[in-house]
Amino acid sequence: MFSSTLHEDGPATRTRSSRRRQRPVASDSSLQTQPKAKRQRVPLTESNTAPTPTPADADAPPEMFEVKPDPVLAKRERDGIGIENIENLGPRRELSLRSKKPKSGERTSKGDGSIILTTNNAFTVSKLPALPDRLRAEPTSRQHGAIFSSGYALALTHTHAFVWPYTATTASPETFTFALPYPSKHASDPLPLGALVPPSASSDDPGLVVVMPVSGRVVYWESISSAATLDFIRQQRTGIEDAISGMYSSEHITQLVSAESAGFVLVFSSGRIAYMSVRDPHGRPGITVQYLRSPFGGASLGFLSTLRHALSGSSRGDIAAAHANHGPRVGERVVIAASSKGRLQAWKIHRGGHHEPVAEADVRERLVEAVNEADAKTQAFPSESFEVLDFAFVPRGLEPKYVNASRLSEALTHEEDSLQHMLLLVGFSRGHQARYSLVETVLAPEGARIGTVRPITSYTSPVRPGALEKPRLYLPRPALVAFVVFDRAVVVASMVAPPDSPDSQLQEDSHILPPTFEDVVDFRDDDTLQVVGSGSEEPGAGTSSEDVRPHRHKTKNPTAVLLLPGVGIVRVAITDIERFASDAPPRVTAKSKLEQAVFFGIKSDNPLVFQGRRALPFSDREVCDAAVELSHEIVNSKTPFIPSVPASLEGNMKSRSAYLDALITFLNACKVNMDERTRWMLLYDAEKMAVATWIWQKHEQFLAERPRADKKTLISEAAVFINENQKTELNVAAGQVDPVRHWFIHDIFRLDIFVAWAYQIIKYHYTQKLSDEPGLNRLVWEAVTINNGALLEARQFRLDKAAQYGVDPAVVPTGNGLPEPWTSTYFITNNLKRLTEFCHQWLAKHDAQPSADPRFDARLLDTVRERLPSLTSQYFTSLSEYITWAASSTDPETQDRCRAYQAAYAEDVYKKIVKLKEFDLWEEAVELAREFEAFDALADVVVGQILMLEAAAADPTTTESKAQENAALAQVKKQRLGRLMEEFGEGFASRAYEVLLDAAGVQAVLEFAFDRKGFITKWLRGKPELARISWVNEVLREGDVGGAAETLLGLGMSREVQVWNKKVELSLGKLALLAEGGGSDDEAGKGEVGGTIKKIDAELEVVKVQDLLYQWILASVHEAVDSSAEVELAVKQFGGLIPRRQKALLQIFEDGIARLLKHEVLDPLTLIDLLTLSSLGPGHYEGMGDQFFLALKVAHYAALENAEEVRRLIWRRCLVRDDWRQVNETNLKGDEEALEAVGETAAYRTLFACFDEESSTPTFRPHHTLKPSDCLGVYTEPEQLDSRFAAMDDSFRGKLVEAMRAEDRLLRGFVEKAQLDEWWRATRETAERMVGVAAQKGHRRVNSGSVGNGGVNGLSLNGRVKMY
């Protein structure tokens, strides 16, 4: 930058001239004799005074000039810049030095040094580097300015004017600073107005004119460069000063409009307009001002009348904009002024100040009507709010292709000088809303015509009252794109014709422009960040051979250029204007908006803002689809915004992660209603980027830890060995030679395959013996590190970012439309299982036989052991995720795999946790089991650890101190077991007791003292097979004798299978019941106990009958060599009465004998079958009692549901045991002989025993109300058979029924042909009488115990006891 003190910025030095004069030596006397001139080069970055330049600075070219119009060096300060004595300046010979001008067409650098702020398929927004240091250092200072086609920018404050080439490629450009002669008195005063004046014939550089709005003072410099040079050399005034006469006290100037070469137009706050010239007719500097007459007002109107008649119908100060267009002849310009209410006025101005009104029109009503018709939303705004904000002239002389592409009217083709073709920026406002439109207007002497209306739909913010600059409209060549510049936004609007369609044709007929490309560039809401000046660049400007100005920007596309304090120059450039005229014009897409927000909004120093101003003009579905597409492109580096060959891969990956974070942040800020699928897909992409970054860092760690000769890590191997169909192939011809970096740049979306390939590398190296044992050990360690760490990182990222992505991390997404979780794909889960099992083998191998190779790193092996529980946890989690996701799928293959995974999970969640015990990972196994609520494994591990410690404590080889330590630790683990029971409840406690019972026995279960919730009691009560332990627990732990009795009785009555056990259990239960009920005063309780005791006694009676039968049969088979022989002998000896053809009865008898000899508890019906089918011999009466009587007792005490049918069966078998036809043959027999025949029958013996039992048990009366004929027909039909045979096949059941019918036929023969019913009555009476006789003789009752013997103890009818 040119400065009175030499600036030392690096970039500036690159643009300085190399033609420097040799620095004189200190002894050079010429320096001492030359007078010292005061240099006014003050650096903009300095404050207050300019220090004396040092010798080191003397040969640097000046970068900034400060020009003083006052010839007298007054000792005053303006805007902090002091004026020192002339002695402080450097040697005069440096003052004329300037940077060398490049030749025509020469570029100062290959690039313009700009920084892209955003870009899309239509335009690019960039920040140019050139900005005066002082403006950059004081962004809060009040300023405004303008951009000129000459390549210069102008900025004005209250005290200074700054001119610099804004297209310069250095940050500190050559800057000309002009101290204004008459600065504003108050900070609130309007800022000075300024403009560059086209170069004169004697100079290539423009001049500068500055007008003070309030005072009307004008200062003009003919050339900015010569003014600076002369001012420094001569120290005298080089600017021309004057004042505008005729201004009112309350009037100030609002606009300074260039109408060169004719001069300038001044717009006053009162509404007046004046012409100002800065050169006289001979081209010499000179300032003159003339007020313009109102159109059609006549020459008689003076300047005062002009104030009344100008813009007739409008209020004072109502002029919104004034612009000058080329006139029909050289030196002529047409100036048009537009009032905010829609009144247009036109003058033709000649060089020298001559002017004439040419047209006037009030188009307000027509504008309102046209806009309302084109944009229905404006009808909701009050018509009083309508105003014209600015206008721009439509370029003439356009190429036919641009004319055809434009939707403007045929006026584009007219070349009449009398027609002024314009585009008006108009708007409605209401509160915080506004609607803007671009309206084509043609102004002619006879009036105005309204053409196409182009609504602005993307920007609805009203104009800020405090904005330093009013909205500006630019329509640069070829008039296909309009730029609407607001204080904090720029609208880029296409003016091309939309594609042909019926709708577009109707809209065209109505002068309505259908929607075409439109986008908004927003600036941040910062007090210092607003547009304070603007301009445009257009193709063709400055391309003539005579134009040698180095700073004029040559462009092929229309551009808007903006000036923002603190930021500098911002250029909004159309990328390719030809696309707008093509069949595929650019359009705003959801993806392009997302790209801008993501890739440029992430920069903290970007003055643009991409969110929060307005909703996205797309549906949620469009935005979601675009977001997913963009996310994939970021992950795969398929977007041009991400370099494909980054210098730092880690930095590149972190940037991509930041882009993904910016994407979801933007979507949330815009309140996009994302569906669940979109949220999960975006989250999965972000997870993959985060994990891939972590893996790359591990890769670099692996490389650093490996020796120089062995740099092939598991990660580099995986990148090479992954199937070519599962990765992007290298293009070696294009220089792609690094497969690892290439994968991390292009294939991260396949991260699940990469992670799964870790096991494949191990498997390949192991099976192919590509690595020795130390090398394979390192690969195993790397594989475990990558698999475990990658999945941990992914799930932690998911947990941390769940709220941001709007998902529940604890819920696996399900549904056919939702993607498969990448952390639980088939490749991941399958290879995790294999890797885990390989680690088991690898650790077991080296635990059994440690490696003797000195290169084998045991620390890596220990790390694998330490990470094995975590790796197992990741395997379980992946399995669980996949099962949950696949369960909702309708794909048959997925469903099959889901079922397979469910089975694998159920198996592995136990086996692989318990497996950890083998590697002394007890605590880790406990935590893993707790995490997955694997209660079986948890119980196994916890109990196993307790038993291991107890065994170690009891080991005689263990030292006493170690034994005590183990015993104490075992107690601690028992306490933890108790806490786990409380934490996980009954299910876990039950499993723990099962493990404890199986491993340590009953004593360990009953002695466990840390069950505070009584889970053992619930467990034992719920386990009928453990009733023998349960009743002990009831007594010892619960103190519940009644409960013990209930347990014992329940076991003995319904579940016990061994006779002896049943007898003991019933007896103990009875004892406990008596003990519990003995202390009760409750009569109801006593009654209940009494009823239970009766049931016990009945069960015991049945048991005693079985025991008697067992003892009788055992005596006959005690010589058998084995159990099979016992059964065979018993069947042979006691089953002789069963006909061989009746196989069913024989099978029942044989099965019953086998069970009887095994001491099994027989069901009552089986026991009755044995008693009634056996041939026990005559001696059994005395030994055990009558068999049929015992069968009747069983039927009586067993309380059978079908007791009557059973009794009929018993009596039928009893009656058919004897041949009643012989008893009925009484011929030649006396009474005594006949009675003796009756007394030898089984019926008599059974009846005698029944009457004898009845004397002690009145309820026992199985012989009353029954006669032989009543026993017919029992169990003779299949449906009558008892429940024992319900599951038998029909063949067996048929045979059994046939056997029953055979019995029935035999009995029927006795009834019908042997008078059995009559003999039954006589036999019954005889048995009853003989029981009485026996009682009178004082004989012991046959049933005095509980079982009678069926005989009469010598009181038989054999003659020793006579009948009376």
UniProtKB/Swiss-Prot annotation:
It is a peripheral membrane protein. Its main location: nucleus. GO terms for biological process: poly(A)+ mRNA export from nucleus; protein import into nucleus; transcription-dependent tethering of RNA polymerase II gene DNA at nuclear periphery. It is found in: Nucleus, Nuclear pore complex; Nucleus membrane. Residues 49-62 have a biased composition (Low complexity). Residues 1-114, 531-554 are annotated as: Disordered. SUPFAM superfamilies: Nucleoporin domain. Keywords: Membrane, mRNA transport, Nuclear pore complex, Nucleus, Protein transport, Translocation, Transport. One of its GO terms (cellular component) is nuclear pore outer ring. GO terms for molecular function: structural constituent of nuclear pore. Pfam families: Nucleoporin_C (PF03177), Nucleoporin_N (PF08801). InterPro entries: Nucleoporin_Nup133/Nup155_C, Nucleoporin_Nup133/Nup155_N, Nup133-like, WD40/YVTN_repeat-like_dom_sf. Residues 1-11, 65-81, 90-110 have a biased composition (Basic and acidic residues). Component of the nuclear pore complex (NPC). NPC constitutes the exclusive means of nucleocytoplasmic transport. NPCs allow the passive diffusion of ions and small molecules and the active, nuclear transport receptor-mediated bidirectional transport of macromolecules such as proteins, RNAs, ribonucleoparticles (RNPs), and ribosomal subunits across the nuclear envelope. Due to its 8-fold rotational symmetry, all subunits are present with 8 copies or multiples thereof. Belongs to the nucleoporin Nup133 family. Functions as a component of the nuclear pore complex (NPC). NPC components, collectively referred to as nucleoporins (NUPs), can play the role of both NPC structural components and of docking or interaction partners for transiently associated nuclear transport factors. NUP133 is involved in nuclear poly(A)+ RNA, tRNA and pre-ribosome export, in GSP1 nuclear import, in NPC assembly and distribution, as well as in nuclear envelope organization. This is Nucleoporin NUP133.
